[in-house]
Amino acid sequence: MISNRKTLTDYLGYEDSDLRFYEILSDKDNYTIDAGVEIVYQHYRKHGFPYYQIREDEKHKHLRKLQKFNVNTIFKDNQITQTMHALRLCWSYFPHAWSVKCGGAKYTPMDIYISDEKFKSAIRKCWKLFDGISDNTIRKILKIYTNSQAVSNFRPSAAKLIYENFGGDTIWDMSCGWGGRLIGFLASSRPKYIGTEPSSRTFEGLERIKKDFNYLTKTVELHKLGSEVFEPEKDSLDLCFTSPPYFDTEKYSDEETQSFKKYPTEDKWVNGFLYKTIENCYNGLKGNKYMLINIANTPKYKFIEEETVRISKELGFKQEKTIELTLSSVMGTGYKYEPIFVFKK
């Protein structure tokens, strides 16, 4: 328990409710679950959603750590294992990600937070599941709460690995998303990144990443439009690499530029968005260069992988192999893999 409570409240301006919350952070066993849940609930109602926070000086430390990391250590037996390098850095630029509808989930993590009843229930589950209460465990429980799902980010370390092993001077990331591949590029030895992203709020986050790391001797060229619209110069690219939208699985925004809005049926999405994106890659790539696409079937849409391979071969790509990308383990359920299809022009 906090022993100098009067000093902290009278002279340093701490409120008693904050001190009780900090006591729970230190040792929640000093409180009953009912009392603790109410204290934690009131804390987050007062201070807001536990977004990822990172200080300015920390940003550069996170990137330097990824720069120094030997990414070849995470590639074995044709599998890429995940690490957390610079992931918090990525998420700090995209607070709106917590409000994005994902898969067939009924709620977003933000929906759970906004609902008094559901948020208290989530805190209670957090209290029982985890050893301690913190911003991190609250974020975790909001992600896995019943009928809730959060969007995922491509691991920057996995992106760096791909750039170092398949890239050249100029890389096109067709669907930038949450910045994992951009941060991975900034930590790599490659000199030029071209990114396309139609979502306005997500694009703003990407622009902030570019600005924060503009001291690096690299070129970052961002375009606020979809990959099916962007036409790179012929034979100008050394690598095309992305993880595109899985049709309407993640609804990043309600803007009409989103692929699931422009192409609202499976057939239109495959032949309008996916086909045109892969065609733009083929036209932009130099000979003997690679296109890597991380995309997977979903329970609702089982055509995605097959159509990606079909279109790529139809346009002239040769499929060399398929890499397995390790995804997060959810509450002890074991690891899951997604394919990264490797095509060569």
Where is each model-derived feature located?
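Helix-to-beta-strand junctions that scaffold the AdoMet/dcAdoMet cofactor pocket
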Residues: 284-287
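Mobile active-site "lid"/loop adjacent to the S-adenosyl-L-methionine
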Residues: 237-277, 299
